[in-house]
């Protein structure tokens, strides 16, 4: 499902307001370069919050996509109570594949 950028926000609001430290990391740079070359492949994992969607997995993809001017993002909506398990899976995937 594609959602306009303005309907998305990061679960960590301070990261969205001041992403400088996040953008200095190697992972962020890899994600930025990947999005430049091939676009968004993996969806953001989100929880519905009223008429908005909270990005719970995919901070780097979201920030890099915003930096590149993406107007919308592919997302998957999960129940709020499932988000911790999704984050565990995605973090273990990153350790193996990056």
Residue ranges and their predicted role:
Residues 82:
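Positively charged, aromatic-enriched nucleic acid-contacting surfaces
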Residues 94-98:
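Alpha-helical interaction elements
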């Amino acid at each position: 499902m594609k959602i306009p950028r303005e309907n998305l926000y990061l679960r960590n609001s301070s990261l969205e307001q001041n992403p400088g430290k996040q953008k200095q990391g190697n992972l962020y740079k890899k994600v930025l370069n990947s999005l430049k070359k091939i676009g968004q492949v993996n969806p953001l994992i989100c929880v519905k919050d009223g008429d908005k969607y909270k990005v719970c997995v995919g901070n780097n993809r979201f920030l890099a996509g915003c930096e590149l001017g993406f107007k919308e993002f592919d997302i998957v909506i999960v129940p709020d109570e499932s988000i911790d398990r999704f984050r565990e899976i995605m973090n273990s995937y990153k350790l193996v594949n990056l």
